[in-house]
Regions:
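N-terminal cap/lid segment of alpha/beta-hydrolase-fold proteins
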Residues: 22-64
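Bacterial N-terminal signal peptides
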Residues: 7-15
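Short amphipathic alpha-helix adjacent to the substrate-entry channel of hydrolases
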Residues: 80-100
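Short glycine-enriched nucleophile-adjacent loop
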Residues: 156-166
Length: 301
């Protein structure tokens, strides 16, 4: 083999290696409808996760940091392929979203092993580390005092499994709820299965967002809500079934209350809070939504 051929082959291998090591990224739906156009991307320092974040970080600093949404996927899928429009839209309103699983460059079902509960903890660990790292582009730009952990279906079970983590300041349980002894046999194998007693470990406000009576998680979620009396809790329902509206443009109708919940509780936006408060909450002015609160909910600021 000649020297020229060897050099050519070496160059090809180097090109392949460089391409494979480049982080993937994609602008989804023109960056969302929010003030801060967002991007979906991989971060080499956070493997097996997808990050949604404003494209331009110059507006964020220690006095105006990005609150955090940590997300777990339906079916414990190791990719947010069903939820990326919803998550991207939230990021465009000034949040950093850390989703469990591999980046979905196309809207197709992910085929691979299930995700784990630990991946949500890895997301929180990463946010903390990046905010403290002076060499990181996220240095002093992440609001580590305002972290919501959330998830859909199996991702909601992962969220409840992790609910005791003291770094969490808010929860959002979507199309999900803990199984009881009577219906545990309906669960898909591999799902985390905390007992109902786990609800006592919740130490933050929590919102359940369900798809109405046709949602297979409706009974579990409503039962959870009725058991939670020690922290502010609400449950909202929209009659769309278990799949929600996440795959619709910008996440569809579910984005409206989810974003308001995050803006109110993580950013202190009182106007957003009117979605859930007052004589006639804003959510009830929207077609087909219902809202129930526990006794502690109206004490929320």
């Amino acid at each position: 083999m000649t020297k020229k051929v060897l050099l050519f082959m070496l160059g090809c291998f180097m090109m392949i290696d460089t391409a494979s090591s480049q982080s993937k990224e994609l602008i989804v739906e023109e960056g969302g409808t929010g003030r801060y156009k967002s991007i979906m991307k991989e971060e080499a320092s956070l493997p097996a996760h997808t990050v949604f974040v404003p494209q331009d970080l110059s507006a964020f600093n220690a006095t105006n940091p990005l609150p955090v949404l940590v997300w777990g996927n339906g079916a414990c899928t190791d990719s947010p392929w069903e939820h990326f429009k919803f998550l991207n839209e939230i990021a465009s309103h000034g949040f950093i979203v850390l989703a469990t699983g591999y980046i979905p460059m196309v809207e197709e079902p992910y085929k691979g092993p299930m995700s784990t509960t630990q991946q949500q903890i890895e997301s929180i660990d990463w946010a903390m580390a990046q905010n403290a790292d002076s060499t990181s582009p996220y240095y002093q730009k992440i609001d580590t005092k305002n972290i919501c952990v959330a998830g859909m279906s199996c991702g909601g079970l992962q969220t409840l499994f992790n609910c005791a983590d003291p770094r969490i300041t808010l929860l959002m349980i979507c199309n999900s709820g803990l199984f009881n002894q009577q219906n545990a046999g309906q669960a898909v194998g591999g799902m985390p299965m905390p007992p109902k007693e786990k609800l006592k470990e919740i130490h933050t406000p929590v919102m359940y967002m369900l798809g109405g009576e046709t949602d297979i998680a409706y009974g579990n979620g409503m039962d959870d809500f009725r058991r939670i009396q020690h922290v502010p809790a609400c449950v909202i329902n929209y009659p769309v079934g278990h799949g929600g509206t996440y795959r619709q443009p910008h996440g569809g109708e579910f984005t409206i209350p989810a974003l308001a919940w995050l803006q109110w509780q993580l950013k202190g936006d009182k106007e957003a809070g009117k979605m859930f408060t007052g004589k006639t909450p804003g959510l009830l002015k929207r077609k087909d939504w219902t809202l129930e609160k526990n006794a502690k909910f109206d004490k929320l600021q």
